[in-house]
Amino acid sequence: YLYIIFSILLVIPSIFYLYQKGTTAGFNIYFDFLLNKNIDKKISTTCFIVIFILLSVVYLRIIKEKNSFKNIKELIKYVFIVCSIFLFMLPWTSSDIFYYMGVGELDSQYGQNPYYITIEQYYSENSNKINDEIMEQAKDNFWANTTVVYGPISQIIFKLCTKISNKNINICIITFKFINILIHLLNCYLIYKITGKKIFTLIYGLNPFILIEGIVSVHNDMFVILFTLLSLYMLLKKKNIVLSVVFLGFATGIKYFSILLLPFIIIY
């Protein structure tokens, strides 16, 4: 219960922000845990560090007492509950998700190729035609003047999420977060299938850093982990090197550095 309590404490500032604003549109408070510009950032940072350390201590204690979960299903259910809490935490440590939305929106709603045109460029040339809160948010993003640096599979995911959202930024961020939660749970299961031990699923599934990066900041590394695990599963459990390479190719289609694992698969 302590892990859930400290998780809720981390989410409370976001709940207050959403209660006051009613939307994520216009969100631009980064590296300020309390999400309140009237409170000194040192106080805000101290609050986060204290809660995060306490959460990490409880996390290490749970790992030590791994037998508190009777089976893998019980463990994954617990991970899902924790992820559901972090679903409501705003991405205050990174603005990347709004960049994902922007390049997805360029593709899905405006038929533009974000590998050739930036969010900033398209918006400046067509601002009088745009009535879109996702683009309004994305144009002010730190990466708005950068073309897509991710692989094509990443872009397909961005495009599908924004297509579903129909220009609604709140639906869009929930869609991205919900998908990352599902991927995180699938990763937990794959780790168990590969290792046969709950402890490794526990170490990954409740890792505070992974939850912050994957569920709160909604980074697409969750998909890299998924396809890498599928690649390892096919190689180690199914002895199928062809499918292993295919899934590694999918991981590379998210972030290009994944190709660096190919020599190890071939050598194996």
Residue ranges and their predicted role:
Residues 1-12, 18-88:
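Start-transfer (signal-anchor) and selected internal transmembrane alpha helices
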Residues 48-55, 101-102, 184, 220-231, ...:
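Hydrophobic core segments of transmembrane alpha-helices in multi-pass, intramembrane catalytic enzymes
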Residues 53-64, 172-198, 225-226:
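Transmembrane-helix motifs of polytopic, lipid-linked glycan transferases
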Residues 71-175:
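Intramembrane catalytic core of multi-pass membrane enzymes that act on lipidic substrates
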Residues 72-74, 191-211:
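Transmembrane-helix signature of polytopic, membrane-embedded enzymes
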Residues 87, 169-173, 177, 184, ...:
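Aromatic- and kink-enriched transmembrane "portal" helix at the membrane-lumen/periplasm boundary
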Residues 189-190, 223-240:
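Specific aromatic-rich, kink-prone transmembrane helix
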Residues 211-214, 231-234, 241-266:
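Membrane-interface alpha helices of multi-pass inner-membrane proteins
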